[in-house]
């Protein structure tokens, strides 16, 4: 019996000799990193890219000259920059600085308070705003400003443009529009009308019909590009 025991003991020791290094290597491989182990570098979040929009509104006003009102906007994160021409008055420009706010999911909203400088035929300082409220296929949008005319206080005025639209499909919308302006002469303090527009990729086209109850309503043709 003793030779058999010695043989088994020798076999067991040989197996231990072979397996222990492999077991130790596996333990070292699976061991958690120590405090001295190098950590992967943190990846900085990239800055939000700029987004731009360009639009041109062509006004066809009865018994008045036709004119084009262009607007350029640039946004990056919270920052909003904007430039307009022929908005507050003809041959008048304005530049704007704003702060973007946004929130909501089902009922989404955006709001941008702004401060602008007006120069040209009308000169002054103008606090303003832009905002949208969206739910389902409905959207309410509004932009306004109050121009403090620094040349003539009687020229101070509140401007507003508001839309309520329904988009049954992604590329088409229609609805109601109102505006309050002094860019051209009108007998109505607030003009009301209808709108219909469609979009293709980054381009959108909209037709506005103000004062449709009049024999000669005001027509505005708008085209916009976003990139």
Segments and roles (model prediction):
Residues 1-48, 227:
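Cleavable N-terminal export/targeting peptides
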Residues 50-60, 70-72, 76-88, 107-119, ...:
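Transmembrane beta-strand segments that form the barrel wall of outer-membrane beta-barrel proteins
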Residues 66-77, 92-110, 125-140, 156-168, ...:
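Feature captures outer-membrane beta-barrel proteins of Gram-negative bacteria and organelles
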Residues 47-51, 65:
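Onset of an N-terminal alpha helix
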